Regions:
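Conserved mid-domain beta->alpha element of the FAD-binding
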Residues: 6-21, 25-32, 153-154, 181, ...
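Conserved FAD/dinucleotide-binding core of flavoprotein oxidoreductases
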Residues: 82-105, 136, 142-147, 186-273
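Residues at the starts of beta-strands that form the adenosine-phosphate
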Residues: 2, 25, 222
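Short, flexible helix/strand-to-coil boundary loops that buttress conserved ligand/catalytic motifs
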Residues: 39, 55-56, 65, 84-85, ...
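C-terminal helical "tail/cap" subdomain of flavin- and related membrane-associated enzymes
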Residues: 1, 63, 78, 286, ...
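Conserved N-terminal helical subregion
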Residues: 1-3, 20, 45-167, 171-184, ...
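Catalytic P-loop NTPase motifs of RecA-like helicase/translocase cores
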Residues: 35-36, 161-162, 302-304
């Protein structure tokens, strides 16, 4: 089949590779004129990295990314609440990777061009809409002209034009008041060089992790960090810029944080470029598929970045879509794909609104009142593991059966 994909992000490119592997003719259309390796840190969870390994990208990932050993959840005083392992040594079939989002996107882009041809990704083509009938779908562009295909996959992100046409009466983005500041800084490594720290609580939170294997080989660490501050009276989401240069007033919220190996205020102050944006998602959709058109990735299920799951769910979408179309070509395959993925991602979106695996931070914050308190006296390991295991079940990354 000839399949058009709107969007050359991680989901759209992963779908291109998976669909090409099944013998389909794929054409990707990207709105921006020039693709650039934008973004900062991203995580690929074990279940999603298995898809990329299956596509033959494991060696390339190991050359650029960090194999995450564990996520350490800590109080603002530095207490270790829980260490949640994410590595093959802990029983996962594939590793979790922490890496630069742009490097992952360009790894996928290079592979698409190498396997499908240089013209497989057309930049400067914003998909603006579509029409369809029993025999095919016609894709239209903001720049004019059209493209005929058997299927259209809307992988065009948070502001998806394909989603907009499928659900024209959808309400505004969902925003509860958390602002996020992000940056990356090259510095000395912390911990073992493979650990992610998440500290604080639902109101004030700090996340950091290394994202570059190449920096590690030079004895340094490229540290990706995210600072989150929740406001009691948030402004409307539509008034909040998606991404802009961030102010530095938020740093005052983290002056009292105490982390082993990390001086958080110093890390924040030494970062040259800081971006700021609201934490936004959308309400889950009742359906993704209409005839020969379906949604994928952020276009289908934008979610809060709890559990580092957004890109991973898009990659899983790509594999399930290709497998479903291999069994049932055409609209029936799209419906089969949705039947598998929509319930899972809906559950993830709603769980992430409740903080996902990061609920352990709020459990600890409610009980730990100062640096002298002992976590082991206040919270049982079983209570913490229940949170972690529950989210692994929801998100679909389970350890191998022993």
């Amino acid at each position: 089949m000839k399949i058009a994909i709107a969007g050359a992000g991680i989901g759209g490119l992963a779908a291109s590779l998976c669909l090409h592997e099944k013998g389909h003719e794929v054409q990707v259309f990207e709105a921006v004129e020039t693709l650039q390796p934008l973004g900062v840190g991203i995580n690929v969870m074990p279940h999603a990295s298995g898809v990329l390994h299956g596509l033959g990208l494991g060696d390339a990932l190991d050359e650029m990314a960090i194999r995450t050993r564990a996520i350490e959840y800590r109080t603002r005083f530095g207490h270790l609440i829980q260490s949640d392992p994410r590595c093959v040594e802990a029983g996962f079939e594939y590793p979790q990777y922490s890496m630069h989002r742009g490097e992952l996107q360009f790894l996928l882009l290079d592979e698409v061009r190498a396997r499908l041809g240089e013209g497989a990704v057309m930049a400067g083509r914003m998909v603006s809409g579509f029409t369809q009938n029993e025999s095919g779908v016609r894709v239209s562009f903001a720049e004019g002209a059209a493209f005929d295909a058997d299927l259209l996959i809307g992988a065009d992100g948070f502001r998806s034009k394909v989603r907009q046409q499928l659900h024209p009466d959808e309400g505004p983005a969902h925003y509860e008041g958390t602002m996020m500041w992000r940056g990356a800084n090259l510095q000395a490594p912390f911990a073992d060089g493979r650990t992610m720290f998440i500290a604080g609580d639902h109101n004030v939170k700090f996340v950091c992790y290394p994202i570059s294997a190449r920096a590690g080989q030079e004895g340094k660490a490229l540290i990706n960090w995210v600072a989150e501050v929740r406001h009691d009276q948030p402004r409307a989401a539509e008034e909040a810029d998606w991404t802009r240069e961030g102010d530095r007033d938020f740093i005052a919220e983290f002056l009292g944080f105490q982390m082993p190996d990390i001086d958080i205020p110093a890390l924040l102050n030494s970062t040259q470029t800081i971006t700021q944006y609201p934490m936004i998602d959308r309400d889950p959709l009742p359906w993704w598929t209409q005839g020969r058109v379906a949604l994928l990735g952020d276009a289908a299920h934008p979610m809060y970045p709890m559990g580092a799951n957004g890109a991973s769910q898009a990659i899983i979408d790509a594999r399930v879509l290709a497998d479903a179309l291999a069994e049932q070509p055409g609209p029936e395959g799209l419906l089969a794909y949705e039947a598998v993925r929509r319930p899972v991602t809906t559950n993830v979106v709603l769980n992430n609104r409740k903080s996902g695996p990061e609920r352990v931070l709020d459990i600890a914050a409610a009980r730990v009142k100062g640096p002298e308190d002992r976590i082991e006296d206040l919270i049982s390991p079983a209570e913490l593991e229940e949170v972690a295991a529950s989210y692994r079940q929801v998100a679909g990354f389970l350890k191998k059966a022993v």
